[in-house]
Design a protein with these regions (language model features):
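C-terminal beta-strand-loop-alpha-helix "lid" module of Rossmann-like NAD(P)-dependent dehydrogenases
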Residues: 1-202
Length: 203
């Protein structure tokens, strides 16, 4: 979790100190479609763990027809398919033993859809692990990257990119997105275990 937060703040701060950059990763695409990576579990008996994530998608401001779902976790696939959501990728096997390479492979597919203009925004729905008795469903925007206004105050500090801004962002942002996704996977596994222990204690 500290690494997850540090990565998010570092990239936001870096971009805020980079002056005016025009890049698709920052401005978003023209498409109204939104890609959402949805992390749930493959098994039940975990209290409201899975249903709380599904509610982030079905009970929020999203328009069903505008969503492309990249699902990690069979329970999310079942629930969202039943409600008529478009599941473009089912990567539920990742949840059995998440690795960074698994995260990178799925992120590459989502980023490819973004760079091709098939989706204009990318979101991540997962369960934030606070402790074994407290887990919080979260929805965050991955792309376009949002610059932290607080970081723009230090106008005397500017970032210089080598060889140029575009190539640097093409290298940095995919790693940034993949790192956030992998961090979310790790938190989700811990949260699932905590939720299941609570459910068993309550049974």
């Amino acid at each position: 979790n500290p690494y997850f937060n540090y990565m998010y703040k570092t990239v936001s701060s870096m971009l805020a100190k980079s002056g005016t950059i025009d890049h698709p990763y920052l401005r978003g695409g023209q498409s109204n479609k939104k890609a959402v990576v949805v992390i749930t579990s493959n098994r039940g008996l975990a209290g409201g763990y899975n249903s709380n994530i599904v509610k982030l998608i079905t009970g929020g401001d999203f328009v069903k027809e505008d969503l492309d779902i990249y699902a990690v976790g069979g329970k999310g696939v079942e629930a969202l398919s039943r409600r008529g959501y478009n599941i473009v990728e089912n990567a539920s096997e990742i949840m059995e033993a998440p690795t960074y390479s698994d995260a990178a492979a799925l992120c590459n597919k989502v980023l490819d859809a973004f760079t091709k203009g098939e989706v204009g925004e990318i979101y991540l729905a997962y369960t934030h692990f606070k402790n074994t008795v407290s887990q919080e469903p979260k929805l965050i925007k991955l792309l376009p990257v949002e610059i932290d206004p607080a970081e723009t105050d230090d106008s005397n500090v500017l970032m210089n990119y080598e060889p140029n801004e575009e190539e640097a962002l093409n290298m940095i942002i995919p790693k940034y997105v993949t790192s956030l996704f992998y961090g979310a996977l790790v938190e989700a596994v811990a949260s699932e275990n905590g939720a299941r222990m609570q459910a068993m204690d309550s049974a």
